[in-house]
Amino acid sequence: MIPTHHRSIETVDLTIAFGQGNQRRQVVDKVSFTLATGEAYGLIGESGCGKSTILRALAGLNSDYQGAILFSNKEQQPLRDKPFYRQVQMVFQDPYASLHPRKMVCNALLEPLRLHGMDRQEERISEVLHSVGLSDAFRYRYPHQLSGGQRQRVAIARALIMEPSVLLLDEPTSALDVSVQAEILNLLSSMRKQRQLTYLLVTHDLAVVTHLCERVAIMHQGKLLEELTAEAIRHGNAREAYTQRFLAASEA
């Protein structure tokens, strides 16, 4: 049990459905979990299990849900306010799609600073680029001039430039080559330690989730089946039959 004053993210009976009338389908079914401040926590499962839908609700991108979402013990309204996004940022699966093709890197990084009225804008851009392993020269490039790994570094920089306390990570390495995946995972790991960030990671990749996370929730058909430590996953120690099959299939 995580003490109340150490809680960063919490969902209570989170339920989400899409469609109308007879076509309405429940995709998340009374999901509850709690993250400690500074923890890296993973949601893993097959495509369509509801994990990305949960992440979008947490980020305020889907306001049609039942149950409660809390950050730092404060229940959030379905429509988030501007201060919320100073504390909570999201990194998406496809870095090319999440960056405006006609905006240079400097403009992509400057936009949130202006929106929130933050000072030292040029210094902040240089600092955050260096923190993700990119030189100042990259500020004058467009997304199509960057490799996949460089684009994802820019996307991470754009999230970090707000100095948030929480990052929501939606399959942040799945669109990248295997060699680049390791670089981005190591970057995310070092950023969490340096900045004392809380991570909620959504992925279908066991290697990714055990590399980055301490605890992992197994999702299936909209339900949270069980929580395991990364160590338990590495050793295949699961209680639920579905989880045992999922772990075995992932190792095959």
Language model segments and positions:
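ABC ATPase NBD coupling module
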Residues: G21, S63, E75-Q89, K103, ...
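Helix-to-loop junction immediately C-terminal to a conserved catalytic motif
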Residues: A59
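Conserved ABC ATPase "signature" region
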Residues: E122-A137, A248
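Conserved ABC ATPase signature
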Residues: Y142-L146, Q150
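Conserved catalytic motifs of ABC-family nucleotide-binding domains
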Residues: E163
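C-terminal boundary and immediately downstream tail of ABC-type ATPase nucleotide-binding domains
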Residues: H235-A252
